[in-house]
A protein has these predicted regions:
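Basic, glycine/lysine-rich polyanion-binding surfaces/domains
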Residues: 2-187
Length: 187
């Protein structure tokens, strides 16, 4: 049941219902391309990207040799030779540098594709029906909508499209609202 009413902290974005889209400037995208992209990413992260279907997403972690998580990702495989990894932008450069160290002879190119994509968080009624289940991906050509676990009983999805394009026409929510719902989703 969602929290209704005021919190002790009046800066909290708590309200009865949320519906809309929030820009996600604090997130970025790592793109892995090539014949060995899925196999390479599968060997470096905590999830299986080899068997990942185009209609599925995975929550994955990049860990150090001691097993400590260095970065977490939401990953999709839009085609057989491409993996897109969405992560916190502040961790992207150092994680990309570390991943590149292990490419060696693999036919895989890694790059920071953040400028090539627009990232929006969809909440509530703005989440399309095919994405109300967590980790389901709905693609409509160039844009991908990824269902995420709900936060405070509000459906959530990540919209990933080409830079310069906008998500479905819905009210815009502050980024702080998305961040609060992200915490409330307990992922």
């Amino acid at each position: 049941m969602p929290f209704k009413g005021k919190s002790r902290d009046d800066n909290s974005p708590m309200t009865e219902t949320f519906s809309g889209a929030s820009p996600l400037p604090h997130w970025g995208v790592i793109r892995a391309r090539g014949a060995d992209a899925a196999q390479f990413i599968h060997g470096q992260l905590s999830q299986d990207f080899v068997l990942l279907g185009p209609d599925q997403a995975r929550l994955a972690a990049f860990c150090n040799a001691k097993g400590r998580m260095q970065a977490s990702f939401i990953g999709i495989k839009p085609d057989a030779q491409t993996i897109l990894l969405v992560c916190e932008r502040s961790l992207l450069a150092q994680t990309l540098k570390r991943l590149r160290m292990f490419v060696l002879r693999a036919q895989c190119q890694l790059d920071d594709a953040s400028e090539a994509f627009a990232l929006w968080g969809l909440v509530g009624a703005s989440v399309p029906a095919p994405c109300t289940s967590a980790w389901q991906v709905h693609s409509d050509g160039t844009a991908h909508t990824i269902g995420l676990p709900p936060g405070a009983d509000h459906a959530r999805a990540l919209w990933l499209g080409p830079a310069g394009t906008a998500p479905p026409q819905v009210p815009q929510l502050p980024t702080a609202t998305w961040q609060w719902l992200e915490v409330m989703s307990a992922v």
